[in-house]
Amino acid sequence: MKKLEGKVALITGAAVGLGKGIATVYAKYGAKMCLVDLLPEVEETAKELRETYGAQIVTYVGDVSNKDHMKEAAKKAKEAFGEVNVACCNAGVCRLAPFEEMSDEMRDFHIDVNIKGVWNSCQAVIPYMLEQGGGSIVIASSVTGDIVADAGEAAYAMTKAALVGLTKCLAVEYADRHIRVNCSQLGYARTPMVEKMAIESNPDNPESAIQDIAVGVPMKRLADPLEVGELFAFLGSDEASYLTGSQIVIDGGSTLPETMSI
């Protein structure tokens, strides 16, 4: 039996990048899914996974920062498959700017997607999980904010660090009702979002910016979204049945080196 067979997962930000990687691994392991994204390309991702893995998938095109949208997405998963066992709260944004130049609109954009989006997703699925006697929530945080930070990332770092606190609070609140809540803390992965950041950092040679990142990682490369998907699959499965409130770093060792040495 595949590790996610019989599980129903709601995955946000599932059209491209990390979300598509997570959805691909979940399909490989037999999960039924509701894929959520603001991008209509989520339909193409679903079609691809149905054809490749025979996965049972419904989609919802909507905005995670809109509470009603997330309630509708969770309801769609429930109506299609009978329950919601796992929520992968992956949707997120990152825009770079010097702090003194960062607009209120840019700050609020990060808060709306990175914090409110996860909040809304959790509030949408938890009632179903309580009704069915448990579930697993996996939140995509980051090493940025809670462990490390770089100039220009104030809004992103602030919002991703907040998700660690949310993870721990929800884990404590729902542990005795069999809902596990964990978060991944990702370094850099080769995704459209990172490629966009590279363009913002070095418009003339974005590939050079990506290679500069890889040089600073002990493993000398960025993560593949499928590797992140494997972590999300473990946390969503019964293999992680005694794991809650955890922060799992998946960064190729990038946060390990001392910044200064003799």
Tell me the role of every PLM-derived stretch.
Residues 3-34:
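Canonical Rossmann dinucleotide-binding motif of NAD(H)/NADP(H)-dependent dehydrogenases/reductases
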Residues 3-5, 244-262:
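Short C-terminal tail/terminal secondary-structure segment
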Residues 98-99, 103-111, 209, 213:
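Substrate-binding pocket helix/loop in short-chain dehydrogenase/reductase
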Residues 102, 148-157, 169, 197, ...:
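Active-site loop-to-helix junction immediately N-terminal to the catalytic Tyr of the SDR YXXXK motif
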Residues 122, 159, 167:
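Active-site helix of classical SDR
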Residues 127, 172-176, 241:
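Alpha-helical segment proximal to the catalytic Tyr-Lys
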Residues 204-205, 217-228:
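A conserved structural motif in NAD(P)-dependent oxidoreductases
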